[in-house]
Amino acid sequence: MFLEIILDSATYSFDRVITGKICFETNAATSPRSFQIQLRIKGYAVYHHGFLSSPSHKHPTTASASDSDEATEIFTHSQPLPIPAGPSSKSHAIDFKFKFPSKSASSLPCSKSNDSMVNICYMLKATISKRYAFLGSSQSAKAELIMVPPNLAGKPLSANSSFGSSAKTFQLPEFDSVTPSASLYKQPSFNSNPAPITTSSATHTSQFSTSSSSSVNSVHTPVMVPNPYFQYNSSMTAPSSSSSSVAPFVPRRQFSVSSASDPPQTPISMSPPIPPTPSQFSAFMYQNQQSYLSPQSHYENPLSISSRPSPCCPSTPSSAVTLSNGFDSQSNAYNNSGTGPPMLYKFPQRSYTAPNTSFNSQRRMSSITSLPTASFCPVKHGVSPPSLAGNQPSPLSSPLTNSNVSPSTICSPDNNVTFVNLAPGEKLTFKIEPNDLMDEEEVVENSNMYSIPGKTVATTVCHSSSSSGDFSALSCHRNLSFSESLPTAEDQVHNNHCAVSPSRRSSSNALYLATLPMGYERSNSVSYCSDSSLSSPLPDDNMLQDPHALNMAYAKEFDVLINEVLQSL
């Protein structure tokens, strides 16, 4: 029987001691001293594909003349292995040490520097014989060699090292080794910074099966066993050898110690401070309202925003205001990974810009995707107001009811409705006072109405994606502003391009929303025209007590809506 090792002669130091373990079994319990083990090392020059083993190595041949590799023995040495005494057993494991003779270590060839078709390999054979009797004919002794790869001391590869096949020269990293198998190991996920492996670790396991006979020096083909310590990956195969009894040379393989994958990056749990500008601050609040009001809304990437309450808006925007965990870890994943809607990760300070057309929601219409022209259907005055339920829990989730207004009613020919054509990117904003719309007796009929002293301003912005005036594609969103007196210039800082003031007036001060064509459907405090139903954000009790805070909250929210319309245009 024999054990085979292949030394990486390009980096191997021939004065290094080779250590290993020889394992075999017998039928009967026997003392280790009953056996004799002879270690023999042989060196071979292997010529690949088309080169004969001539001294010049420069004689190419045709495929029909030489289809396999040729191996020439260039070195041989043998030494007995001392076996210590031990208890009798059937299984034996004997440690061994082997070292090249000092005289030949300095003269041993490593590789042919000018010919990549020639490789040098060395094979260590262990011949086991019993002193008094041979192994039984039915016994197949097993021998296993576990040795440290001789090239793992961190020495760099020489520039003239050339291993491989088909005239390919491989420049391998520092910690590479010849593996005892050509195809039984999987290719490792190569670690760019592998830890150096000490020479005391056992890394290679080769197992051979040999049937015993009277000739103890017979050579048999080794059977390789995968090593559990490493994962090997190689697309190369060893050169076939059909004309030589020597086991074929196995090229070097890249490998790395298999290790656990890197832990996933933990998203940042704290968001940066809110930008000082009002538009950026309102964008932060709008983002939180999105996560509270519409947990089903999602991006197409997809990434669902978790539902959670949003913090209250302060009365004035300030750069010192921070959101404690204002964004969940999922939304932070966008900025960390650089994926998702472009507007959400382009700005490092989270200066929010309204999502572009990739933003999708179950409650949003597709009309926001393209807006070549805009058409606006004016408001019909004098219709009965919708009732506002006063017991709604959320100031941004209370729908308006009792709306019987239809598009045909508002935009009918007998109402003398005129259309305003808006250029792309142009906004139409008009403010309506509740006293201009209805008579007082029409408002008193609703007992659940909110009543606020002062003026109420309903601001509406509409746009359409239809160039033919189709009202089904009309999109509108509104915003309310409350003040103790008439609206001032400070309340109208949202770039109003045009103001429409109806002529009808009444003395009602009740909270009232203007009735708009096509109705509304609420989505994250943004109302879009989709049917004849109406929906609008309502104030809660705390904000009703502070009209200025309510006014600021809706003003900031309206600023986000304007930015969103501009982005969509």
From Swiss-Prot:
Family of this protein: Belongs to the arrestin family.
InterPro entries from the UniProt entry: Arrestin-like_C (IPR014752)
Alphabetic keyword roster: Conjugation, Meiosis, Stress response
Keyword Magnesium in annotation: no
Residue ranges, annotated region (Disordered): 195-219, 255-274
Primary gene name: ste7
Gene Ontology biological process terms, A to Z: conjugation with cellular fusion; meiotic cell cycle
Organism: Schizosaccharomyces pombe (strain 972 / ATCC 24843) (Fission yeast)
Main function: Has a role in promoting meiosis whereby it is involved in establishing the mating pheromone signaling pathway. It also has a role in suppressing meiosis until the conjugation process is complete.
Protein name: Protein ste7
Induction data: By nitrogen starvation.
Biased segments, Low complexity type: 198-219
